[in-house]
Structures are given as structure tokens and as C-alpha cells.
Amino acid sequence: MKVRILTVGNKMPKWVQTGFDEYHKRIQPMLTTEVVEIAAAKRAKNPSDANLAQYREQEGQAILAAHAVAGREQLWVLDVKGKMLSTENLADKLSDGMQQGDDIALVIGGADGVSPEVLAKADVKWSLSALTLPHPLVRVVLMEQLYRAMSINHNHPYHRGN
């Protein structure tokens, strides 16, 4: 199984890259992961609602193009309105995917959200939190949760649960 993280934006602050890299390094023996950075749409200083929709559309097309390159993979989209999963539920979903031989593309949208087209094609809509999280922090939290879930699946002591 391979998980590709399709994320809008690049040039993350050093603390984000350091945190992400730590969990990315730790997870590799358990799960192959790859990061695909998608350029954010160029934004106006005071964008209108129409501009915001255009940014989501442009980024959405790039997300779907990156997803299409891989062939057969499930599309999981991080969305505030998505289903919340416990770490144990995530571990189960990843385990099921591994048994079925499914690859996963996990989408972190841009600052203005994800296009309706991407949401419509999503196999899973997942909310990390009811809180609004900054996109750079989502990268770190996502990778840590993937690592924690895989630790559960491999009986690694990292996750001690409740």
C-alpha cells in the first residue's frame, strides 16, 4: 500500500518541515508515503467570492490531475465537514486498505478549501478536527496520525491508547 499526500502549497515554515520529516521518516518501514505539492493559485489581495471559487476550481483541477496519474487509488479528502475518525478507526481503515491492496491519495486542500469537483469524487471525506487548523499544521498532524495508526497496526508501543 502506498499513501500519496496531495497538498496544495509549498515552502512550508522550517518547523512544519521538521515535524513532518520526523514522522515521514518513522513511518517508512510500515507504509510507503509520498508528498505531491500542488502550486496554490495566485491570489488577489482582496479576492471576491468569485475569485475564491476560481482558486478552488484551479487547485481542484490540479489535484484531480495528480490523482489521475496514479491510476487506481482511493481519494480521501480532508474536509471540515467530513467524518471524524478516531485513531483506532483510522488504523482499521488503513489495515482494510492494505488487505485489499488499495493505494490512497490524501488531499490537503488550499487556504480556501477544496473544489466541489474534488469533493464529489472523494471516496472518503475525513475531518481531522472540528477546529479550523492552519494548513501547514495539518501536514504535521496528518503524518503523525498516519504514523500512530500504523503503529497500532504493527503493535508498536508508540500508541498506548487510553
From Swiss-Prot:
GO cellular component: cytoplasm
Protein localization: Cytoplasm
Protein name per its UniProtKB record: Ribosomal RNA large subunit methyltransferase H
Domain of life: Bacteria
Source organism of this protein record: Psychrobacter cryohalolentis (strain ATCC BAA-1226 / DSM 17306 / VKM B-2378 / K5)
Residues in coiled coil: none
Class of this enzyme: transferase
Database matches in Gene3D superfamilies: 3.40.1280.10
EC number, as in UniProt: 2.1.1.177
Leader peptide range in chain numbering: none
